[in-house]
UniProtKB/Swiss-Prot annotation:
Belongs to the adenylate kinase family. Keywords: ATP-binding, Cytoplasm, Kinase, Metal-binding, Nucleotide biosynthesis, Nucleotide-binding, Transferase, Zinc. One of its GO terms (molecular function) is zinc ion binding. It comes from Borrelia duttonii (strain Ly). It is found in: Cytoplasm. Its EC number is 2.7.4.3. This is Adenylate kinase.
Length: 213
């Protein structure tokens, strides 16, 4: 099944995508991870992406579409994967429909105040890039990774100032996707304000229903 996870930053779609990719053996394609890989490798594209992200802006469609399309073309099983962070707007959605058929959409619903709390509490390991949250997914030892004992840090775009810009961009560009997919009966809403285990359970129920139809 080809799944697209929609939702604002901080809705938990990335965390759930990683969990389900392990349980269902789906390939997890995260635009955020793809961008970070380019940044870490200091590619020309990575340098451009880094500047855009640090300014709290969304990466342009031309770059995003190319990165995602290239990645999809490299995976072995193109029938079972999760797209996390793509598409972000109508133009990207149209391009995705051109590339793939029978896409199912999961829309993560969550209150904006809770989003800010989640994102401002997010911490990432400098060594292994595992993601934690001081509010919802704390480490056993403060600011130390549970997996590799690396040092945790807060991304520049997770500060409250950058978050305001990111949420404004989301409301402007990504929210219209809800109507786009709802009109074609592909939208499946899920309450993302609950804890990870509950969200995962509810999502598995939705996936089961989709498979039966």
């Amino acid at each position: 099944m080809k799944l697209v996870f929609l939702g604002p930053p901080g809705s938990g779609k990335g965390t759930i995508a990683k969990i389900l990719s392990n349980e269902l053996n789906y390939y997890h394609i995260s635009t955020g991870d793809l961008f970070r890989t380019n940044i870490e490798n200091d590619t020309p594209l990575g340098k451009e992406i880094k500047q855009i992200v640090e300014n709290g802006q969304l990466v342009p469609d031309s770059i995003t579409i190319k990165v995602v399309e290239d990645k999809i073309n490299t995976i072995d099983n193109r029938d079972n994967f999760i797209l996390d962070g793509f598409p972000r707007n109508i133009n990207q959605a149209i391009e995705l429909d051109r590339l793939l058929e029978n896409i199912k959409i999961i829309n993560f619903l969550i209150d904006e105040k809770l989003l800010v709390k989640r994102l401002s509490g997010r911490r990432i390991c400098q060594s292994c890039c595992k993601i934690f949250n001081i509010y919802t997914l704390p480490t056993k030892e403060k600011e130390i990774c549970d997996f590799c004992q690396g040092i945790l840090y807060q991304r520049k775009d997770d500060t409250k100032e950058s978050l305001k810009i990111r949420l404004q961009e989301y409301n402007l560009q990504t929210k219209p996707l809800i109507n786009f997919y709802s009109n074609s009966n592909r939208l499946n809403n899920i309450d993302a304000s609950k804890n990870i285990n509950e969200v995962q359970k509810n999502l598995m129920e939705i996936i089961s229903k989709i498979e039966k139809n």
